[in-house]
């Protein structure tokens, strides 16, 4: 069956200590690619995975992705990256406070035995000093099989600037392509604005968090709508600012209209990957409706389902019809401003 979507992102071996002493996930499939897929698969599972892994990545996980109906032929096994650590660690000290460091102390705080498989873990330095630096396990444009380059709806998860820009160039050739991009926080700084503007010309929808977009315009403006307008001047016709529990701001550049969407109210279990799940849902909604506000509502539903569970595929555990019911309810939670 042909795939409607391609998502490029990172895969990790995830160690997660959720908020409120939730059930720990130890050496489980993680990474922003999977969380975005979980949000999209609520609506449509015909997805090509674009990623890069080394030989330490469990083959049985790849088989599980295939069993779920995902196309794994875009995952490139790179034997030259076997020295790279694929582990990730996330611990919540509070519902909204997460840490990627000092795993030993976090396991002790949670009164959990420290897993031997996490020994020697060091978090990746996310500081960006040079935009030409690449992440050793980010997906690479020239590894994408040719048969996937004509897929019409593509989402790029956060990873390094160079790899993202090369993938935008790879996919933007077709007039029917819709590319959404979630920026990596490391390069959302005023010093990198000139380079970012070049990449934006090939992007349909730009999906930053409020924190990221404020960082980009630090010292220039506090007005989120002005920020969205300035970004749209360089190409993206849709700007969605993800605002966590406050919902989303949606700027429709083509119509010059602004919308505020409330977050669907749910009980928070684990916010890990909620922004990625939103982006996956957004892409599904945009493919179905070609409408930025409707697309953001699809994303909001996916985000709400993710918050209620732990693990990238938890949005798929909802009762049949739940996503559609929430989508209907959200129609009343949109306000034009």
Q: Which positions does each model-derived feature cover?
A:
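Conserved phosphate-binding/catalytic region of the ribokinase-like
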Residues: 2-3, 153, 221-337
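Short, hydrophobic/glycine-enriched beta-strand segments
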Residues: 2-12, 180
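Conserved N-terminal subdomain of the carbohydrate kinase-like
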Residues: 13-17, 21, 46-153, 324-337
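Short catalytic helix/loop segments, enriched in acidic residues and glycine
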Residues: 21-38
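Alpha-helix C-terminal capping segments
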Residues: 37-46, 285-288
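Short, conserved phosphate/pyrophosphate- and ester-handling motifs at nucleotide-, phospho-/glycolipid
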Residues: 40, 209, 275
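Short beta->alpha connector loops
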Residues: 54-55, 158-163, 184-189
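Conserved phosphate/ATP/ADP-binding segment of small-molecule kinases
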Residues: 166-178, 183-260
């Amino acid at each position: 069956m042909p795939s409607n979507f391609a998502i490029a992102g990172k895969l990790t071996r995830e160690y997660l200590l959720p908020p409120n002493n939730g059930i720990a996930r130890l050496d489980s499939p993680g990474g922003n690619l999977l969380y975005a897929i979980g949000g999209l698969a609520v609506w449509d599972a015909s997805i090509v995975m674009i990623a890069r892994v080394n030989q330490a990545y469990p083959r049985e996980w790849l088989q599980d992705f295939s069993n779920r109906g995902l196309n794994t032929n875009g995952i490139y096994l790179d034997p030259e990256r076997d020295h790279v650590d694929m582990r990730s660690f996330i611990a919540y000290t509070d519902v909204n406070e997460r840490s990627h460091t000092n795993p030993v102390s976090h396991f002790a705080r949670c009164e959990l035995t420290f897993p031997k498989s996490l020994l020697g873990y060091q978090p990746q330095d996310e500081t960006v000093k040079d935009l030409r630096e690449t992440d050793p396990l980010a997906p690479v444009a020239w590894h994408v099989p040719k048969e996937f380059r004509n897929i019409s709806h593509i989402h790029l998860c956060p990873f390094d600037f160079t790899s993202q820009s090369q993938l935008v160039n790879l996919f933007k050739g077709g007039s029917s392509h819709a590319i959404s991009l979630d920026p990596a926080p490391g390069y959302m700084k005023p010093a990198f604005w000139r380079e970012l503007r070049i990449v934006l010309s090939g992007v349909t929808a730009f999906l930053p968090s409020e924190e990221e977009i404020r960082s980009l315009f630090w010292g220039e403006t506090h007005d989120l709508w002005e920020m969205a307008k300035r970004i749209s001047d360089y190409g993206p016709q849709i700007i969605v600012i993800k605002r966590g529990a406050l919902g989303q701001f949606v700027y429709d550049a083509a119509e010059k209209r602004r919308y505020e969407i409330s977050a669907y109210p749910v009980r928070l279990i684990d916010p890990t990957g909620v922004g990625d799940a939103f982006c996956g849902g957004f892409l599904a909604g945009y493919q179905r409706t070609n409408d930025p506000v409707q697309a953001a509502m699809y994303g909001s539903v996916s985000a709400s389902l993710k918050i209620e569970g732990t693990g990238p595929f938890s949005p798929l555990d909802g009762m049949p019809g739940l996503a559609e019911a929430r989508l209907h309810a959200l129609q009343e939670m949109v306000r034009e401003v």
